[in-house]
Amino acid sequence: MDNLNDALEKLKLTGTECTSDKLDGCLDCLLQALGHNNTESSEKIQQSGILQLFASILNSQSSCASKVAHIVAEIAKNELMRIPCVEADLIPPLVQLLHSKDQEVLLQTGRALGNICYDNHEGRRTVDQEGGAQIVVDHLRSRCTLTDPSSEKLMTVFCGMLMNYSSENDSLQTQLIQMGVIPILVDLLAVHSQNTALTEMCLVAFGNLAELESSKEQFAATNVAEVIVKLFKKQTEHEKREVIFEVLAPLAENDAIKMQLVEAGLVECLLDIVQQTVNSEKDDDVAELKTSSDLMVLLLLGDESMQKLFEGGKGSVFQRVLSWLPSNNHQLQLAGALAIANFARNDGNCIHMVDSEIVQKLLDLLDRHVEDGNVTVQHAALSALRNLAIPVVNKAKMLSAGVTEEVLKFLPSEMPPVQFKLLGTLRMLIDAQAEAAEQLGKNEKLVERLVEWCEAKDHAGVMGESNRLLSALIRHSKSKDVIRTTVQSGGIKHLVTMATSEHVIMQNEALVALGLIAALELQAAERDLESAKLVEVLHRLLSDERSAPEIKYNSMVLICAVMGSEPLHKEVQKLAFLDVVSKLRSHENKTVAQQASLTEQKFTVQS
């Protein structure tokens, strides 16, 4: 430490006038001290006021510039020294040194700027103002194909500098993307795949940029998928594969890149990893199994990539995924069910899968998770069943297979995601299936649970689906028994509330169901309709200019129907319905205008 003090004193006394040899000796002493104890030595250097002298030496383009840059790089490893480096105006001369032709000067300058920028807003801002990032990007572009060790080392440092400069800063990352850094990084990865340090630095830089939506198009315009999959296939260590996974996940959110990754053979790699890790209990293997199967499911979210892997239901990938359903591994069961749900995004696939008896595999899986089951697996399997039930031709087949009976086993579930999918599955199954709708609609336990969930204000999705299923049971069954069960369970008020929904489709479903109630069982429901203020709601819907034509039409049909009830008729007479309906006779929609004329006639006859 005495040597350090002596060197600092000499530098202070002689400054830039010191001979080159003496200056070199003092700087060597500083480097030695920093290597021995960075924290203490860097603080002593700052306290001595020498940092300002460094700015002068760097500005003078002295032959000692690379050594000074090296010292700054070492000092800036210390978090507390980064702001002092900015305040000593070291960044402008360092950025100027980036124009040097000397490899060592560039290396130490890149290190110094990278370390100053690490988690340091002021440092980044100054480098940005001085145009440092553009110079570094240009260096990488011009040197990309050089494979000598010193060039690769320099490019590794420059990639690290850009990473520290832009990390967790969207505007600086966007700036780098606009400078064209993405194709450069992809080329670096392709050319230097044998260089571990440079490869890892490129991947970390990818990871930073891939999160940005604006980066996805640029990545898609390169051969990034081919390059990364090629690199991925070479990796045998967990840690290195994990770094690549961290890049793949955000990239695979883009549909074009999904397809590129599938074509580059990523799925086969993922399936191999699943096979290697499925029976292992090691933490690393368990984590890698999850990451691989999750990524596999993500690739299936793209329509094009999903169809390519489905291959008309004959694809080897599709068959492998099916084999995950009966597995004893919860993660594979989950991924298998989610994959089926993704394959079931078009009618053709759904029809093929139902004909291939996949429904039974899903029912068997659900049956294993009824008692204290895995909620995520329940949710995924129900999602798959819901999607499979969408095509009309599948509904009867799925009902015959016992899907409703299995789904109803989850009625006691207190988990909103499971409740939501359960409701959606039942609603899809009974669409235009009168017998099934009647059977379910007479199930008091189900209807009571629906009424309970119609009040689940903390879970809008569950509340909305409950209302829709309640309405669907009536609309598709057209059954007096179903209506009576709904009345007894207290469901009428929820259908009236549903008629005021912000979603036109829900409003309409409610009005049609209420119309059937009024036509088939008005007497049984009139008290509930009155206390739910149905007539006021209908008056509001007809008066509101924003109401859709079908809402106005069905509201008028319903008004005509409820006039058969004395108390409801009185409610109608209290409100100025005739004025509202008369105005609708000139409505631009002919069906609405015709119904307005009919309704007006009914009012005239019955008033």
Swiss-Prot record:
Matching InterPro entries: ARM-like, ARM-type_fold, Armadillo, RAP1GDS1
Keyword Transcription regulation on entry: no
Annotated GO biological process: positive regulation of GTPase activity; small GTPase-mediated signal transduction
Pfam assignment, any one: Arm
Swiss-Prot/TrEMBL keywords: Cytoplasm, Endoplasmic reticulum, GTPase activation, Mitochondrion, Repeat
PROSITE patterns hit by this protein: ARM_REPEAT
Disulfide bonds: none
Domain of life: Eukaryota
UniProt entry tagged with the keyword Cell inner membrane: no
Gene3D superfamilies assigned: Leucine-rich Repeat Variant (1.25.10.10)
MF term (GO), any: GTPase activator activity
Annotated ARM repeat ranges: 79-118, 170-211, 347-390, 391-431, 479-519
GO cellular component: cytosol; endoplasmic reticulum; mitochondrion
Subcellular location: Cytoplasm, Cytosol; Endoplasmic reticulum; Mitochondrion
Complexes and interactors: Interacts with ralB. Probably interacts with the post-translationally isoprenylated (geranyl-geranylation) forms of ral proteins. Interacts with both GDP-bound and GTP-bound forms of ralA, but interaction is much stronger with ralA-GDP.
Stated role: Stimulates GDP/GTP exchange reaction of a group of small GTP-binding proteins (G proteins) including Rap1a/Rap1b, RhoA, RhoB and KRas, by stimulating the dissociation of GDP from and the subsequent binding of GTP to each small G protein.
Protein name: Rap1 GTPase-GDP dissociation stimulator 1-B
UniProt organism field: Xenopus laevis
